[in-house]
Structures are given as structure tokens and as C-alpha cells.
């Protein structure tokens, strides 16, 4: 499969490397509006400068591409994704699906009308840590899940568009964790209460810290807290998690997974908590491909053979509604129902 990559700076580096590693995907061309980025990346990745175009329509006209990879900032996703599908091409886009819920729904509408694949790069789903958590929860070993907590604290200095966003943490980072909640629970959010704020030392223009309480179908509850301007004791990018289950607890800390199971509940003895087994560290699931490599492989398979692709625009719109529901709850101070 031959692809046009739109945007080759910043996060584009990750996709340049993923395509160059793939035995099934090659570059037909690139789109980059910044001449300095085009020059630097052509040298760093040995790209043919003649294949770097200024616009997607120009690249579509000049190449024989089969698909498009969109790595532009969110405000351009609607334009790029719809242009690709209007040209008859499947598209794999970086998250978020779009910069606004209206734009995201417009992309979904075109995907539905055209029947073309529009995939969203929710790469955090495809990591050994994530797949192990999902497998343990689905096994039923710890019984029914009643509640979960997630905490994320880091202090990255990105520069660029993220530092100008109104809700940088929620829209650009927490979207991963909210999407993982959907994956882990097999449910969509139904009601959200949330607050966001910006600490005095923040280098972000918008709110870089937030806390949320989420209710899912069947009354399952989740709490989330996070910050993108934390100054110490950082969590991993995957966040720390705690899953409260019927017969034990699954805890994730610093990318390590621990389980402890309840062996006997001392219901008749006041003040006694019951008997538990020893805390076990769970081995991580082995994966032949991870992250963007996994997504690229699955996208290629789905686009060429019609196999299923989990994070289509049609599925991911529920993650977008979740994310924008959190932002609406932060802005309004009221509980948002989805």
C-alpha cells in the first residue's frame, strides 16, 4: 500500500518511522507546508524532496497513492480526512478525530456515505500493558468490576499548538485514557461531572489540570485526575490505574500490573477485612507489533482486504463525545449527560 503522509514534523516523526519499518507500506508522497521542516526531515529520513508537496490536492494529483495518513493539528482534520475520502482513499488520522465535535461528526458522515475506512490512531490501546489489563478484566478472575480510578501527572514542554489549546490535557492527552476506559469497560460514558484549572506556574494558555467523575452504563463509576504541568513524581504516559472488583483489585503503577484476590470474606466478624492471597505482579502480554506499528498493519489489512478495524471514526465518535462531555462539564460546572 502506498500512502501520502500529511504533516511530517512533530508527531509525524513517529509515522515516518512506522512506515519505513513496515514491509507492506511505502510512501507515495508527503505534504508539508513548512519549508524548513521539509528540508530537515528529507535529510533525516532520506526522503525525496520532489515528493514533498504543499497541499493534499497537489499530492493526490501528482501521485498514485492508495491511502492517506493525517498527522496535522486537530483543527485541520476535517479538511484533510474529507478530502482524502472524496478522492476515494481510506485515511488513518491522528487523534483526536477532529478539533470540534461538529467536525468529528462531519467526518463520520462522509465515512458512512462513502463506505471508506477512516481510522483513528488510538495507539494506547495497542500496548502490552493495555492488552494485559484488558485480558485480566475479561478473564473474570477478579469478578465483576465495580469502579475504577485513573491518575495521570506529567509536565511536558511541547511548544506549538498544544500550549494554545483551551483544554490541552483533556483533548490531547486524557483522550487516550478516556478511550482506554471505553476499551476496558466495554461501555460508553453516560454522565460526567468535571472541573479544570490552570496552576499559577503553568506554561499552557488553557487549563492543564482536571478532575472528573464519570458514570457509565449499568451504573459503573470512574474517577480521573490529571495534570500536564506537574513538577515531580510523574506517572507513566499510560497513567496509574486501580480497578475495584468483586473478588479483588487490579492495580497499575509505573507500567507494572499487580493483582490481589479476596480468598474469604469475614462477613460475620466485625472489623475484619477478610483473607487475601499474596500480591502478584502480572506478566505483560507479548505483542508482535505495538502502538503505531500495530495500527499501521491493521489499517493496511482493513483497507486492502476489508478486515475489521477497531477504532474507526464511527466507533471513535463515542470517545469524542466522552472527551467533549468532560470539557463541557468543566466549562459549565454542571453534570453533562450523554
Model-flagged regions — what are they?
Residues 14, 33-36, 283-296:
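Active-site loop of classical SDR/Rossmann-like NAD(P)-dependent oxidoreductases
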Residues 117, 124-204, 213, 333:
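Predominantly a Rossmann-like dinucleotide-binding segment in NAD(P)-dependent oxidoreductases
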Residues 178-259, 293-305:
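Contiguous beta-strand/loop segments that form the cofactor/metal-binding neighborhood of enzyme cores
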Residues 67-69, 217, 298-338:
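C-terminal helix-rich "cap/oligomerization" subdomain common to oxidoreductases
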Residues 5, 70, 93, 99, ...:
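Hydrophobic residues in well-ordered beta-strands that form the structural core
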Residues 15, 34, 51-110:
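Beta-loop-alpha module in the N-terminal Rossmann-like domain of NAD(P)-dependent dehydrogenases
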Residues 1-47:
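N-terminal Rossmann-like dinucleotide-binding module
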Amino acid at each position: 500500500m502506498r500512502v501520502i503522509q500529511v504533516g511530517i514534523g512533530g508527531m509525524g516523526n513517529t509515522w515516518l518511522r512506522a512506515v519505513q519499518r513496515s514491509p507492506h507500506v511505502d510512501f507515495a508522497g508527503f505534504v508539508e507546508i513548512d519549508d524548513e521542516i521539509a528540508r530537515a526531515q528529507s535529510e533525516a529520513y532520506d526522503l525525496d524532496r520532489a515528493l514533498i508537496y504543499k497541499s493534499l490536492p497537489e499530492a493526490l494529483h501528482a501521485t498514485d497513492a492508495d491511502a492517506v495518513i493525517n498527522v496535522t493539528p486537530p483543527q485541520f482534520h476535517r479538511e484533510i480526512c474529507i478530502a482524502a475520502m472524496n478522492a476515494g482513499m481510506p485515511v488513518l488520522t491522528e487523534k483526536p478525530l477532529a478539533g470540534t465535535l461538529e467536525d468529528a461528526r462531519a467526518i463520520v458522515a462522509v465515512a458512512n456515505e462513502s463506505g471508506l475506512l477512516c481510522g483513528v490512531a488510538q495507539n494506547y490501546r495497542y500496548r502490552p500493558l493495555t492488552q494485559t489489563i484488558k485480558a485480566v478484566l475479561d478473564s473474570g478472575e477478579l469478578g465483576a468490576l465495580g469502579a475504577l480510578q485513573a491518575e495521570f501527572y506529567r509536565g511536558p514542554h511541547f511548544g506549538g499548538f498544544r500550549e494554545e489549546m483551551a483544554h490541552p490535557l483533556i483533548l490531547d492527552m486524557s483522550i487516550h485514557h478516556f478511550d482506554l476506559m471505553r476499551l476496558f469497560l466495554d461501555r460508553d460514558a453516560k454522565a460526567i461531572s468535571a472541573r479544570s484549572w490552570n496552576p499559577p506556574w503553568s506554561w499552557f494558555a488553557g487549563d492543564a489540570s482536571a478532575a472528573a467523575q464519570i458514570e457509565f452504563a449499568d451504573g459503573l463509576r470512574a474517577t480521573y485526575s490529571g495534570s500536564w504541568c506537574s513538577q515531580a513524581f510523574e506517572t507513566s504516559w499510560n497513567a496509574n490505574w486501580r480497578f475495584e472488583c468483586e473478588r479483588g483489585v487490579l492495580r497499575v503503577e509505573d507500567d507494572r500490573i499487580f493483582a490481589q484476590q479476596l480468598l474469604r470474606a469475614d462477613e460475620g466478624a466485625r472489623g475484619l477485612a477478610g483473607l487475601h492471597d499474596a500480591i502478584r505482579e502480572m506478566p505483560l502480554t507479548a505483542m508482535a507489533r505495538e502502538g503505531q506499528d500495530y495500527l499501521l498493519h491493521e489499517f493496511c489489512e482493513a483497507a486492502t482486504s476489508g478486515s475489521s478495524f477497531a477504532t474507526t471514526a464511527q466507533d471513535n465518535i463515542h470517545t469524542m463525545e466522552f472527551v467533549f462531555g468532560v470539557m463541557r462539564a468543566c466549562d459549565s460546572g454542571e453534570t453533562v449527560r450523554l
